[in-house]
């Protein structure tokens, strides 16, 4: 009788340890995804903060390009109002396309292309886009690891019991990727911005 009770408690303790360990592993992976998403949001905000200065600089040279300015403002507002990863990815694609059209305006205005403020803003935007690409990749890697963890047996049992859901990937809109190709005749300098 005592031996059976000891075995029973040992099995219960092992099961409880496995449940707690699995739960903590899923929580850790989920928090990693949240942290990586925060980095994406930081870079999206940094880019969004650069846009008004860039728009104002371009406006000084090409006030008649009002549709492009409106498109940039609307896309920026949609990105700020995004409620989840999917909406943010879609709004980011729209903003990238609008920014591409804004930067393409510089081809028609040699004085704008030579403006040091424009060049610096363009360099800062390029650096931010690079940091954003890294943050998106890190987020997607973390989301993939989390999703794999909550789908693998036996952790899937704990994940379902505790209500953990699959995380969305930050997918770039293929149309926006085509629009974001910018051809600038003069190479820009790269600044080290921290």
Sequence positions of predicted segments:
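A helix-centric hydrophobic-segment signal that preferentially recognizes long
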Residues: 1-185
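Single conserved hydrophobic/aromatic residue that forms the stacking wall/gate
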Residues: 182-194
């Amino acid at each position: 009788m005592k031996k059976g009770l000891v075995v029973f408690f040992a099995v219960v303790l092992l099961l409880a340890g496995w449940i707690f360990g699995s739960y903590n592993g899923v929580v850790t992976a989920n928090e990693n995804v949240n942290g990586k998403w925060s980095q994406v949001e930081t870079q999206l905000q940094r880019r969004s903060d650069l846009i008004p200065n860039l728009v104002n600089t371009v406006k000084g040279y090409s006030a008649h390009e009002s549709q492009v300015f409106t498109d940039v403002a609307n896309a920026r507002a949609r990105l700020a109002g995004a409620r989840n990863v999917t909406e943010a990815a879609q709004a980011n694609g729209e903003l990238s396309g609008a920014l591409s059209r804004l930067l393409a305006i510089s081809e028609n205005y040699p004085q704008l292309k030579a403006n040091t403020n424009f060049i610096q803003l363009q360099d800062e935007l390029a650096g931010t886009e690079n940091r954003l690409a890294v943050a998106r990749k890190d987020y997607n890697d973390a989301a993939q690891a989390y999703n794999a963890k909550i789908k693998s047996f036996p952790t899937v049992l704990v994940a379902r019991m505790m209500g953990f859901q699959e995380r969305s990937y930050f997918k770039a809109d293929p149309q926006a990727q085509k629009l974001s190709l910018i051809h600038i005749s003069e190479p820009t300098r790269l600044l080290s911005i921290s």
